[in-house]
Amino acid sequence: SLIRKYGFQVFGFDPTPRAIAHAETLRCPNLTVYQLGVSDKSGTAEFYLPNDPHHVSGSLLRESHVGRECVTVRFVTITELLDLIGRDRIDLLKLDIEGAEYKLLHSVEFAALAPKISAICIEFHHRWPGIGGHATLRAVRHLRSLGFGCAWRSIASNEEFTFVRCSN
């Protein structure tokens, strides 16, 4: 709806085959979707598909709801993402990377690029076994140390957050 309402140019990155197939049906000229994941490291990795055929989200982490099937997918770093789309900054970075957000946020590369990001919408996956709420608290503190302030948080789920740049 941001594309229709405001004419935004949107770049999407998703390694999930079903998500790519859906994006192709939209036929939207201001939407460019790449069948790539975003991670703290570039390369290829096993990406675990959802066990429920009605679900779309897979993960790099093998959890109880994913993992019966997997595909090998290509991942890029945020620096490579910017190079690919020909931009030097990100106005809004939306991350829903199914548990891989913690490594990405704590990477040296993310810290170096943080001043070039104006806002971040992120879904944290602390409900997953082996992650826990402490990982999200640590990530929020880290984002604050990088100059971001929390502008919004979902009270219902306590998993979706929006951060905006407050300082460099």
Briefly describe each language-model feature range:
Residues 1-168:
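Phosphate/nucleotide-binding beta-alpha loop and adjacent structural elements of enzyme active sites
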